Structure formats: structure tokens, C-alpha cells
Amino acid sequence: MRSDKKIDSQGKPVDDDEILIRLLCSPLQYDKETKQVSIDAFDLRMMGKNHDNLEHFASLGRKVAIEDEDEFQEYLQKGYSIWNDKEWEENEYYGYGTFRCKDALATNDMVEIHPLTGAAQHIGMYYAKNEDEYYKGPLPKENLEVFEMLSDLADLINDTVVVAPARS
């Protein structure tokens, strides 16, 4: 059985019709010129100074847990803490795409969405590697099934992307 210490097994399951948010905070994730979401938008990252911390899940926002427009704008600004200053000098925007939980789950059997411990506004999108474990970043895009899954997830939000100017 797959498990992750951040999954809140006691938390309320995510409703099939719940609207989820994926922040798009980098040209690696969304091309403003072509208006295309990249497959990297749902990939798992390597983080840390030496890229030794591998992401276990893609963090998604829960629209239902964001109470008003001010809180929503504050949530959108979280993308700035994801990328370091050097990368932000090249960014001109932040953006996000929305989708229903059940639509993401329908893209591939590997996709699982779970509530996270201590995180009301966030949930985790996990990718099942086998019956015992989840993938850790980055995903093996040379695997056709993984590539198609990421492509389907990108297509899922492509028509819902909202782009706003970066903070000044």
C-alpha cells in the first residue's frame, strides 16, 4: 500500500466536483506567447541547494478553502516563494489554471489526490509508481504513459489559465 507522511488520512476526502487550482509561476510551466501549458506544470521538482530534496506531490489549491478575493490574491502570490530571485527577474507574470478533481483523476490511474496534514488551502496530487510507492521528482517523461498523463493534465487546464502581471 502506498503512503506518504504528508497525506492526512483522517482528513475529509476531496469531493469529485471540487475546483482545484494549479499555480503557473514560471515560463517552464506556461508559455505566455503561445498560451500553452507545458507538461512541466504538473511535474515533480528537485528542490534544495543541491537538488537533493525531491518533491513527492504537486501542490494544488482548494478553491473551497479560500474565503474571499483578498485571500485568493494572497494565495496566488505564494508562487513567488517557489522560485528564487534570479529566476523571478525573468518572469513577468503569475498565473493559474483550474479544474475539477474528478477530471484530473480521469486522466490516468496513476493520479491520486489527497488532503494534506495541516494544510486547509492545499492538497497533494500524487503519482502512483506501483502498488507500494509514489513517484518522487522529477517524473520519467521518457515513459510514454507518464508523458501522456502530464500532457493530458496540461490540456485539462489550458483553456482555464488566467495570467496576471507580476508584482512590482
What are these regions (language model features)?
Residues M1-A58:
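ADP-ribose/NAD+-binding catalytic cleft of ART/PARP-like enzymes
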Residues S3, D16, D40, F72, ...:
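Terminal low-complexity, poorly structured segments
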Residues I7, I19-I21, I39, I66, ...:
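Weak global preference for isoleucine
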Residues Q10, L24, D40-F42, G79, ...:
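Compositionally biased, intrinsically disordered low-complexity segments
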Residues G11, T34-K35, K86, G118, ...:
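Intrinsic-disorder/low-complexity loop/linker signature
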Residues P13-D16, L23, K35, D68, ...:
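Short linear sequence motifs
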Residues M47-M125:
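ADP-ribosyltransferase catalytic core
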Residues D103-S168:
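Active-site or metal-binding loop neighborhoods of secreted/extracellular toxin and effector enzymes
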